């Protein structure tokens, strides 16, 4: 070793050792050289300084280069340097005693060889076996506060590549990582540098879960990079790039070739083991309850797995667990495949896969109970019984098969039930379980049919029910108000006498031919006029004849309609013939008489005095022309006493605002005569005479206002004081 270089590098190494390293990093350095790791930080630094003194005394260049790499954080490079260069270090502080010999008291000093970690041993997992390691452990140094990137490469061996291509489901390529400080001390736990890392294989992102349970190392799985690995052997190999940050300690990364096992394979391995017998478990239960100071009581055991909450199929537990409660093997393995915690779900103790056994007592209970049972009770003597408060779920083996009922809902006929009229009773199917309680009976399902319309009611009723049932249905439909007027008309009496004074008697023939012809017309007119209900004014009079009595179907029935008589002192309203009367089921032979009679009570317009004007109203009915001849005597007297307005004509010279566009004279107001005391010059003023107080005082207004004028129908004549113009 060059002494000049050694003395030049020594101050920087000592400064880095005393100020730039923490306890885990100091332990990594001591672990590389196989020194003791216990003690405080000062003791660890002192131990490393003693190592530097021995290296300088022995002039060991290889150990010095490895120590510098370890102090810089590259523990893997330091291990690789020491791999092919073994040196001997004699420690005076802690010599290693040789093993005692039975032949004599011979003693000797064994030289210490540094630990070279060319292969990392990870904790064994039941889901894979590590067959081959493709690269030496690559160190990922600590990185706090910044982002770091490291890269390395590896080659797949030809035998591994051949197996990988032939059976890719059974053979895979995994990337492992573990803290560097744990190397050389038993099985290493799987742990990535940081959850915020990115792994790239041949410039492709490897999607994996890098997180672990908080405070529980070894609860993550290695990254499966099989699909990203090149499928050929030799250079240039496969490039690995890791981006990470906030890593407080260094890690070692290695790529391995593994053989994987499925959950079915592991379950078969458990079944192949010897199970714990039922008798042995019962004996253990009795022994645990024999203590006189402890009063043992019954224990409720669930038949459901505490992990999947479903019924246990294969009850297993650890051989070291003493509880009766078991869990399902498949659910337990599936949970640990995702997150390898390997904790008992009942007592939270650590479990190894090799410790799992089948519980014979629990397996016997599962085979003896129905599939819908959930809990059992075990007494201190090992006897068990099914809990009676369990309410089993209805299964296909224990159930009733009721026959369906169809309920038809319609607007006119109410509710009618179409059910199977057979007297066959549903029979209970045979049950294969004898120990469980009987299953409940299912509720009978009712099917309601809402697709049947009013037009199909009569057809559905006649095809499915007997005449006696039809009578009951008709009686039920009387209480249901429905737009179907045929049903309502058929259930009413045919002789309807309305006591209203405004209708005149008519005779309507009730014949089968007329009923068939007027069924749709009567329903449409009655619904349109608002007579569907029984409370209408013409509801009783406009109903069709009943069809209940077949013997009296050809008889005639009378409906009394009274004519409205107008009052002589009130202007009568104009009434048009009702469409409901013409649309009734009246024969054609009587329909003419009915229409003629309806004209007699149809009134004319309001009575007005004759103004000698042309009648512009068109008369639609011929009977309105003779209306005035049918008036009563009082009506005529009242008509003659109405005063008539006298007619006037305007002289030819007074044209102006009193003449229309056709130059025809019309009635106008009379021309006032001139006042006797007004001056002539004021007559031409269009605004009227000016009022003068002195002249107005000379006028005798009492005589002017007391003048009597008489009028008669033939013309206009005035008497009394007259006005004369002043010429």
UniProtKB/Swiss-Prot annotation:
Substitution effect: residue 323 to A: Reduction in sumoylation of rad22
Comp. bias regions, Polar residues: 417-435, 459-494
Subunit structure comment from the entry: Interacts with hus5/ubc9.
Domain PINIT, chain residue ranges per copy: 108-261
Family label: Belongs to the PIAS family.
Documented EC number(s): 2.3.2.-
The protein, known as: E3 SUMO-protein ligase pli1
Subcellular location: Nucleus
Effect recorded for residue 326 to S: Reduction in sumoylation of rad22
Residue ranges, annotated region (Disordered): 408-558, 706-727
Organism the protein comes from: Schizosaccharomyces pombe (strain 972 / ATCC 24843) (Fission yeast)
